[in-house]
Amino acid sequence: LTLAKFRAMRLLWARLLEVNGAAPANLRLHVETSFRMSASRDPHSNILRATAAVFGAGLGGADTIAVLPFSIAQGLPDRFARRIARNVQNILLAESNLWRVADAASGAGYVEHLTEALCEKAWRHFQRAMDGDWPQPDSTRAEGLPVIGTSAYLPPTEYPPAIEALR
């Protein structure tokens, strides 16, 4: 989904410029991993979450990515957590060569379908907003869904990370 969101953003940007008669312009897309996706009960699982998020954002066309340290939900991350956050990007960049392909997901049926569906839904929301009917967020959508490391598949023993200050 992350990958399709970023692809959709670029398509929507181009459409918005076209509809408004503006000249085509590049979209500079800077993203950051989400604090909300960080589990506080099993912080080490956040390393995997960050890796998946960076991978999706990179394949989706993000220009720059900031990775929050895995222990951010507990407090001020220590040097190790900050180092891991930097290394997530460095490893994906240097070892997977994500940067070598402009749109690696192009032609993948499911990704193309998901990107198109996101574009259509976002454009409808945008049109409604422009007509003064601002869409309201649906906070009930994710209620009850399990979160790995928080409400499902908890580690048998907690291994708290080192932090420099409490949150």
Where are these regions (language model features)?
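Short acidic/histidine-rich active-site segments
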Residues: 61-72, 98-105
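Catalytic-core signal marking the mid-to-C-terminal active-site face
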Residues: 83-167
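Short, glycine-/Ser/Thr-/acidic-enriched flexible segments
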Residues: 34-37, 62, 70-72, 153-159, ...
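Helix-rich catalytic cores of soluble enzyme domains
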Residues: 1-57, 68-89
